[in-house]
Swiss-Prot record:
HAMAP family: tRNA_metthiotr_MiaB
Main location as per UniProt: cytoplasm
Cofactor note text: Binds 2 [4Fe-4S] clusters. One cluster is coordinated with 3 cysteines and an exchangeable S-adenosyl-L-methionine.
Domain TRAM: 377-439
UniProt-listed SUPFAM superfamilies: Radical SAM enzymes
Lineage: superkingdom: Bacteria
Top-level taxonomy: Bacteria, Pseudomonadati, Pseudomonadota, Gammaproteobacteria, Enterobacterales
Residues annotated as domain MTTase N-terminal: 2-119
Its biological purpose: Catalyzes the methylthiolation of N6-(dimethylallyl)adenosine (i(6)A), leading to the formation of 2-methylthio-N6-(dimethylallyl)adenosine (ms(2)i(6)A) at position 37 in tRNAs that read codons beginning with uridine.
Name of the gene this protein is made from: miaB
Binding site for [4Fe-4S] cluster 2: C156, C160, C163
Alphabetical list of InterPro entries matching this protein: Elp3/MiaA/NifB-like_rSAM (IPR006638), Methylthiotransferase (IPR005839), Methylthiotransferase_CS (IPR020612), Methylthiotransferase_N (IPR013848), Methylthiotransferase_N_sf (IPR038135), MiaB_methiolase (IPR006463), rSAM (IPR007197), rSAM_horseshoe (IPR023404)
Name of the molecule in the record: tRNA-2-methylthio-N(6)-dimethylallyladenosine synthase
Organism the protein comes from: Buchnera aphidicola subsp. Schizaphis graminum (strain Sg)
Amino acid sequence: MKYIYIKTWGCQMNEYDSSMITVFLEKTGRYLITKEVEKADILILNTCSIREKAQEKVFHQLGRWKKLKNKKPDVIIAVGGCVATQEGKEIFKRANYVDIVFGTQTLHKLAQMIDKVEKNRRFMIDISFPQLEKFNYSLEPKKTGYTASISIMEGCNKYCSFCVVPYTRGHEISRPSDDILLEISILAENGVREINLLGQNVNAYRGRTFNGKICFFSELLRLVSEIDGIDRIRFTTSNPLEFTDDIIEVYQDTPKLVSFLHLPVQSGSNRILQLMKRSYTTEEYEKIIEKLILARSNIQISSDFIVGFPSESEEDFQKTINFIKKINFDMSFSFIYSSRPGTPASEMKDNIDLQEKKKRLYTLQNCINKQTMSWSRKMLKSTQSVLVEGVSKKNIMELYGKTENNRIVTFKGSHKMIGKFIKLKIKKVHTHSLQGELI
């Protein structure tokens, strides 16, 4: 029996892929997963390339693993994920001690690649895009808690000027709806209560049914809501361009779909949105939000923002701040623009000083944090339904769970409550977390 250590960086899709790798390898009967890196015979790094810092982080990590390989020459190092797909053979040039490079769509071939390396001691690479082949090998999902994320589609066809996803994950491909529903049903039977549907552009889902018909995302959401045991449904990440009325209508008739939506806008300036090739305007985005509020009056919105995009003026940035206030976003993921090789934006002149970018990022995050706290204060003394997930990491005398709007709540309660929905009264609020007590 050999031990495998997996380190995962990046999005929830990467986390899902790593869980698939675990199931694939353990199913062979030859491997066990370990959390002790020094104990491992095979080291797997599942990578992210969405920003330059994340990419360089990969090679720093590989440098640390090189020291382990110097001590144990038979250790196999495998690099997967988006950096692997983007860099390919260049990884071997920068880190010639790496044995395997596999792509986002070839992780099901990893056991076979490990076998070949062990026999021939030659490096292996497969970063091809065999479409949904990896899901054809899907095995019984592994429960790791009372919430679970599953991939319903991969890739993106939008080709935003700053984004590497179409190059690292391929074009949009949707899993068959019956495969998704079966996987969720198995998870529900094993105690999962909340499901998160994943995709780079999840609302573009167009999966085939068993009789060859198309199942649209709105229909899939309703089908998931009918699965016994699943009481909460989330999804991420969606694109405003395809956030259609039929999806909005699900918020009217499907209470299991949470009143919290992550809908990236990226900028509040139409000029910058055009340069980003986002294919919508702030006015069109605002119209979607207005319809969502009509469908679900208590819905809260989070978003993504990029500051310092090439040629972004102070006026453009101020439009973003004004838009943030107008929509009243609850939370955000916000970043300084990072040029990615091979994207159209990388050819644009980056004429904004780094200190100015940092200043804008600070201003934007400060604005969002004030709004986050404002949303949290509205929850004070309210009663919230919380899915209890486990013992608090900060205080072992307390439990923690999440509200529908993604707030962590800590409280004193019995361990028998873990995995169940309970009612809590909110007694104290912080920006991103809450404290409650049992009713």
